Amino acid sequence: STAADAEEKLMNHLLSPDRYNKLIRPAVNSSQLVSIELQVSLAQLISVNEREQIMTTNVWLNQEWIDYRLAWKPSDYEGINMLRIPAKHIWLPDIVLYNNADGTYEVSLYTNAIVQNNGSIRWLPPAIYKSACKIEVKHFPFDQQNCTLKFRSWTYDHTEIDMVLKTSMASMDDFTPSGEWDIVALPGRRTENPLDPNYVDVTYDFIIKRKPLFYTINLIIPCVLITSLAILVFYLPSDCGEKMTLCISVLLALTVFLLLISKIVPPTSLDVPLIGKYLMFTMVLVTFSIVTSVCVLNVHHRSPSTHTMPPWVKLVFLERLPAYLFMKRPENNSPRQKPANCKKTRAENLCMDPADFYKNSTYFVNTASAKKYDMKITDTLDNVSSHQDFRLRTGTKFSPEVQEAIDGVSFIAEHMKSDDNDQSVIEDWKYVAMVVDRLFLWIFVLVCVLGTVGLFLQPLFQNHIAATNP
């Protein structure tokens, strides 16, 4: 007979209804345990849905056991020592994924089982599992997750079958790398319940680490750049009128990023994701920059008619702080300033203020003008007596017209002097606002750099999630 005839004869013999019932557990007696060796082979990590907390994987569930009823002598059947029998024609252990998330407990395809002549059976069905996975969002997007696959018999307890872990690690021989996750480890463990002797399961821990490049490019770097714009608010001149506009725009941009984060991570109150902490940190900074900008603008637009500058403000913001902030106030070269090095002469009244000059009892007048207004002149200075055009007036009164002109000139001089003083105070207030701006610029740069580095260095020191028994 041919090999095909021998195989058909063997198949009919093994699966004959008279000697084999696929509904009966392959045990010699009721007290015998059927040992099931189990190993998971990971083919693909399809996705991890953070918001729904579901991990989708493509695995091969390798199961091995012995069915004494399917043993034969190869010499009786043309030396055939292995058969491939459709799985639905033999007894199968009803091992299912206990922590599935979509109600699909069984495998995707009932493949053929490989049966050896000694009765050992190896069944390797593929399955796409959606398992519940508790997402730890504390270090997102630099996070590491521990998702488990828990396998257990649905109807048989520990008194009927014994689940044995074939190897301590899941197989990755046929694994296709994921673009989002790195596999850190796939340890397996066999779990028994001391309080329930009938309980046994096999659990695999999928310890995976996220590849953060996508979120770094699309979330973190834009947030850092937007935060730097908030810092530049303090370098913006107060006169341009765009300080508040820039602050509000940056705050709105950060709010949009915060909404994006809320759609990615699960709505849990146990932890705040790292990127969420950073966004809140930057939003607090921007809010504080708005408050400080309001204060700076208030100082910038102060005047002598509304505010008096306290001495301590002059001491701190005009004398002390600028040196520490590397600021140097330019010299005031206003043409209205009095000459600083006016030389003292015998005619020192020439250096007096206009009001004092005209009110003084002695000053120079033109001789022609003096005759016209009947002024008495006298030569009292040696260095002036030689001049024919100018003489000194002694203490005589002016005519009403001249006195009125002198009063007008004196009023104008006093008004100009008052304007100069007011303008000087206004410039002082503006410089104080500039110093405050520069002070907060350095403070914000320091806080922003330290806060950013401190937050994003945390994942480097996180502990790896280890597999622990429940």
Swiss-Prot record:
Locate the transmembrane regions by residue number.
Answer: 217-237, 246-266, 279-299, 439-459
Q: Where does Na(+) bind?
A: E242
> Mind telling me which GO cellular component terms the entry cites?
acetylcholine-gated channel complex; neuron projection; plasma membrane; postsynaptic membrane; synapse
> Which residue ranges are assigned to the Cytoplasmic compartment in the record's topology?
238-245, 300-438
- Topology feature Extracellular, residues: 4-216, 267-278, 460-470
Signal peptide span: 1-3
Q: What does this chain do?
A: Component of neuronal acetylcholine receptors (nAChRs) that function as pentameric, ligand-gated cation channels with high calcium permeability among other activities. nAChRs are excitatory neurotrasnmitter receptors formed by a collection of nAChR subunits known to mediate synaptic transmission in the nervous system and the neuromuscular junction. Each nAchR subunit confers differential attributes to channel properties, including activation, deactivation and desensitization kinetics, pH sensitivity, cation permeability, and binding to allosteric modulators.
This one is known as Neuronal acetylcholine receptor subunit beta-4
> Whose protein is this, by species?
Gallus gallus
Cite the source lineage.
Eukaryota, Metazoa, Chordata, Craniata, Vertebrata
